[in-house]
A protein has these predicted regions:
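Conserved catalytic core of sirtuin-type NAD+-dependent deacylases
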Residues: 1-168
Length: 168
């Protein structure tokens, strides 16, 4: 986790990029599981919004269309200087990659020491506040501020369903 910080990126961007490139390639080899597909199939019958801390893009690859990625996506890049952002579609010739403006590109993920993107966070609060049912899957609910989203749902009278092998 030492490399998952803004400080590590500016200290050694090449090392951080090598680590993320390895993770990205591994993630691209992984297929969505039955749970991902079940959630995407629910969209055919109900209004489903996915609020996820995962950065792997598996929800979208399973067919889900309304996904709020609180911690960003390892499949996207953004510039450290300008507003450029895009999906990663090919391997980079050298690391760290450079933007057309000359700035360094970085993985579009939230690192330790950074805040969540405010537009995504505000959308997540809104969705949690108006949902009828919130299904919480595979999280310990210890990472703040995402762990407050069930509180917003419960304050609105939503039913909370937790699916987790460990007690939280």
């Amino acid at each position: 986790m030492k490399l998952a910080s803004i400080d590590a990126f500016y200290d050694d961007p090449k090392l951080v990029w090598e680590w993320y490139e390895d993770r990205r390639k591994n993630i691209l080899d992984v297929k969505p599981n039955e749970g991902h597909f079940a959630i995407s199939q629910m969209e055919e019958f109900k209004d489903v919004v996915i609020l996820t801390q995962n950065i792997d893009g598996l929800h979208q690859r399973s067919g889900s269309t309304n996904v709020l990625e609180l911690h960003g996506s390892i499949i996207r890049i953004k510039c450290t200087v300008c507003d450029f952002a895009d999906n990663i579609t090919e391997n980079f010739e050298s690391l760290p990659p450079k933007c057309k403006c000359g700035g360094m590109l970085r993985p579009d993920v939230v690192w330790f020491g950074e805040s969540l993107p405010q537009n995504i966070w505000q959308s997540a609060i809104k969705e949690a506040s108006v949902c009828d049912v919130m299904v919480i899957v595979g999280t310990s609910l210890v990472v703040s501020p995402a762990n407050t989203l069930p509180v917003y749902a419960k304050q609105n009278g939503a039913i909370l369903i937790e699916v987790n092998p460990e007690k939280t």
